[in-house]
């Protein structure tokens, strides 16, 4: 990069992109005392929700709880701007319970802008970054081997302004060379109504970072005044008292609204089949992979041809807008056919379309080029977070933004990065998946991706991560005190339930036996009572067997801990056993191609990813248990050879001293 202009300003950290990843990253670095600038193409669309105006859902809600437990923002804003909340999977076990909030998208963005503007050490800049400035230094290592180290120095905007930075975090979302498609028509855009980011992809290639192409999409928005709601099933808000945030000061003053449900019809399906050739994917205009778990309506009709109907949700985008988001109905069909399709749905026969659905393809950075800290392997102090890493969803983006922000500051402070493991969090599961697997489609977090989902619940995210958030410096003293008080009450209640015993001769015992149909033999502790499948903490309250008026989160935590005690102990033992084996480090200089006892696929994948330890190596596709055993043996032989060489050298040196 030629420096045609002098430095405008200098910052410790520059964040490129003002989406959910960028906001979390910028707030994190600024809160930790580092001068930060957040650059975005449009300051009026900060933390925008260009697709679904919702936060949470299966596994995603666990991510939001975790980000909040660490001191992040997304959970608080989702709580404060929620206009509907529901618990998903409530009839199943606690491992998969999920809070989902419909949010007011304009209110969400407005509140995020207010937070950014009032965060110390943080500057907001409207500009398009097109170049990264890299410094190169040559180092001489072992055996006089020369290596070139690259480090980020600063950034340049489209119009030539230069800003120096000690660290840079790229959170460009879908904007890198973004192109939106409606039918066979396309235009350059990061999302509808906003220009794409030009130039940065080419610059990334020049500095040694590869990019590939992905696709996503968003459905049409319709005018709620044109919908016949009497023809639809209603879906009311049923969990307004549930929160993503563990901060007791967070409140919601938004009015609660209902969503509605309609379904596709045979007419819908036939119209799609007749026009498949006009879509960007089936028409062959683009070949980028779309998200498996959020397919277009044409994908659903093709892949589930035997299904007669698909559920479609109508979700308000806010309190003061007539726009309704047609969830489950994203498409790349031409605009006129989209309206025809919408009018085949019950309740939408006379609807007015305010915004058409569109597909968007964009460049992303395959995350196998990143370290676990989200720093790029190629360039020091350059981090990448969010949808640019191949993920889909605000929640995944926010979590990565916080991790990148924390680790950028730790790198600048010469501290070791914070590494989130699969055993500790969904954040760790997601990052491990991203950096060890070649993505062929946008990645979304799922409960099925975690081997430890009973341990990694949403309700206990604070117990798992708040202490870490406090140690990092993102949890303030007030929040820390509230957390400690909660832990104290939770442990005291579990102790009380274990010690308090009911005799079967007591009147309350007879009442419980009569109403539950389960006998009490001799006597029983309240803990043993709570272990029964059909007995809940609410029953303890009902039978006046409580002492303190504990909050619902403590009641829930106590019940889960007791009911699932055996399972949780087994999972804890498994985690400890895995940790003992997986923490064994793997030297980064190993050339796996030369280890002939490894399978060819294992050699290729290990060399490409360069795992830091056996735990990471075990999660790489194509690396079998046999490969891990062979690698362990190879390392042991290597260590023995090194020890023998050291003994030989010591003897040589010793004999030389004696001869002198």
From Swiss-Prot:
Signal peptide: none annotated. The keyword Cytoplasm applies. It comes from the Bacteria. NAD-binding protein involved in the addition of a carboxymethylaminomethyl (cmnm) group at the wobble position (U34) of certain tRNAs, forming tRNA-cmnm(5)s(2)U34. FAD binds at residues 17-22. One of its GO terms (biological process) is tRNA wobble uridine modification. Homodimer. Heterotetramer of two MnmE and two MnmG subunits. NAD(+) binds at residues 290-304. This is tRNA uridine 5-carboxymethylaminomethyl modification enzyme MnmG. Belongs to the MnmG family. Keywords: Cytoplasm, FAD, Flavoprotein, NAD, tRNA processing.
């Amino acid at each position: 990069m030629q420096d045609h202009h002098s430095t405008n300003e200098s910052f410790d950290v520059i964040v490129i992109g003002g989406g959910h990843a960028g906001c979390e990253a910028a707030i994190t670095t600024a809160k930790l005392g580092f001068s930060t600038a957040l650059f975005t193409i449009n300051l009026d669309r900060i933390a925008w929700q260009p697709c679904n105006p919702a936060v949470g859902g299966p596994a995603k809600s666990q991510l939001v709880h975790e980000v909040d437990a660490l001191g992040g923002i997304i959970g608080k804003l989702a709580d404060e701007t929620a206009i509907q909340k529901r618990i998903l999977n409530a009839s199943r076990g606690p491992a998969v319970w999920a809070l989902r909030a419909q949010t007011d998208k304009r209110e969400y963005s407005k509140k995020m802008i207010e937070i950014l503007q009032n965060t110390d050490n943080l500057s907001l800049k409207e500009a398009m970054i097109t170049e990264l400035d890299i410094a190169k230094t040559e180092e001489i290592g072992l055996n006089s081997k020369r290596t070139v180290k690259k480090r980020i120095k600063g950034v340049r905007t489209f119009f030539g302004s230069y800003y120096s930075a000690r660290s840079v975090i790229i959170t460009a979302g879908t904007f890198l060379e973004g192109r939106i498609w409606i039918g066979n028509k396309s235009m350059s855009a990061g999302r509808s109504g906003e220009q794409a980011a030009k130039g940065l992809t080419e610059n990334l290639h020049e500095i040694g970072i590869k990019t590939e192409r992905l696709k996503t999409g968003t459905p049409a928005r319709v005018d709620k005044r044109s919908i016949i709601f009497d023809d639809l099933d209603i879906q009311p808000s049923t969990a307004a008292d549930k929160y993503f945030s563990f901060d007791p000061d967070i409140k919601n003053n938004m009015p609660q609204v209902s969503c509605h449900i309609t379904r596709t019809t045979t007419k819908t399906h036939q119209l799609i089949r007749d026009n498949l050739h006009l879509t960007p994917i089936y028409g062959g205009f683009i070949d980028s992979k779309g998200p498996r778990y959020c397919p277009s309506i044409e994908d659903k009709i093709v892949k589930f041809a035997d299904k007669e109907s698909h559920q479609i949700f109508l979700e308000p985008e806010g309190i003061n807008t007539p726009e309704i988001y047609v969830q489950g109905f994203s498409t790349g069909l031409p605009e006129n056919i989209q309206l025809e399709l919408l009018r085949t749905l019950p309740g939408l026969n006379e609807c007015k379309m305010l915004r058409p659905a569109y597909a968007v393809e964009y460049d992303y950075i395959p995350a196998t080029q990143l370290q676990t800290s989200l720093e790029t392997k190629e360039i020091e102090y350059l981090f990448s977070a969010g949808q640019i890493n191949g993920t889909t969803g605000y929640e995944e983006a926010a979590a990565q933004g916080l991790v990148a922000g924390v680790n950028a500051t730790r790198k600048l402070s010469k501290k070791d990065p914070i590494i989130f493991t699969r055993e500790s969090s969904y954040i760790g599961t997601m990052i491990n998946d991203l950096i060890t697997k070649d993505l062929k489609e946008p990645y979304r977090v799922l409960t099925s991706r975690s081997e430890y989902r009973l341990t990694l619940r949403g309700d206990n995210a604070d117990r798992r991560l708040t202490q870490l958030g406090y140690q990092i410096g993102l949890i303030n003293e007030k929040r820390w005190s509230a957390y400690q008080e909660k832990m104290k009450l939770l442990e005291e209640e579990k102790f009380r339930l274990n010690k308090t015993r009911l005799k079967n001769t007591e009147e309350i015992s007879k009442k419980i036996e009569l109403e539950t149909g389960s006998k009490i033999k001799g006597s029983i502790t309240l803990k043993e009572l709570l272990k029964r499948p059909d007995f809940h903490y609410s029953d303890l309250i009902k039978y006046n067997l409580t002492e303190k008026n504990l909050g619902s989160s403590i009641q829930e935590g106590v019940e889960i801990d007791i009911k699932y005690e055996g399972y949780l102990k087994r999972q804890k033992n498994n985690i400890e056993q895995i940790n003992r084996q997986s923490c064994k480090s793997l030297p980064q200089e190993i050339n796996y191609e030369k280890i002939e006892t490894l399978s060819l696929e294992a050699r290729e994948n290990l060399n490409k990813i360069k795992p830091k330890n056996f735990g990471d190596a075990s999660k790489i596709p194509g690396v079998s248990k046999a490969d891990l055993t062979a690698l362990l043996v190879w390392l042991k032989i290597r260590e023995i050879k090194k020890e023998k060489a050291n003994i030989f050298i010591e003897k040589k040196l010793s004999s030389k001293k004696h001869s002198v």
